Amino acid sequence: MLSPKRTRFRKQHRGRMKGISSRGNRICFGRYALQALEPAWITSRQIEAGRRAMTRNVRRGGKIWVRIFPDKPVTLRPSETRMGSGKGSPEYWVAVVKPGRMIYEMGGVAENIAKKAISIAASKMPIRTQFIILR
């Protein structure tokens, strides 16, 4: 699963997901892409599940690019813990995704294969997405 090698600070604020994605909203590497239509946190497990599903579906040939990276730590407190005594410890990593952001890209395969593989990956995502073709 994806996670940063090291970060400057161990814990982060939750933040807000306002507006649309200004970066990573165009197809850069492949010919087909999966684009987010809603804002969300996508965990490293979800990213990996989608990537594996796509890889398994295209088998040999074809290349997949993951355009998002989970660089935000999410902290959780132990269950049945009283209030206070600081922020919880980092448990998992998420990528902050805004509408318009490309999540995966794919190239080197036929359109019908790409559409099938990307739709399987889309079902692993917690948000509505759309399939995009570079014309």
Swiss-Prot record:
SUPFAM superfamilies for the chain: Ribosomal protein L16p/L10e (SSF54686)
Keyword Cytoplasm: no
GO cellular component, one term: mitochondrial large ribosomal subunit
Coarse class of the protein's main subcellular location: plastid
Statement: the UniProt record of this protein carries the keyword Acetylation: no
Keyword terms: Chloroplast, Plastid, Ribonucleoprotein, Ribosomal protein
Alphabetized GO MF terms: rRNA binding; structural constituent of ribosome
Entry's localization field: Plastid, Chloroplast
Record-level GO BP terms: mitochondrial translation
Subunit description: Part of the 50S ribosomal subunit.
Protein family per UniProt: Belongs to the universal ribosomal protein uL16 family.
Protein name, per record: Large ribosomal subunit protein uL16c
Organism: Populus alba
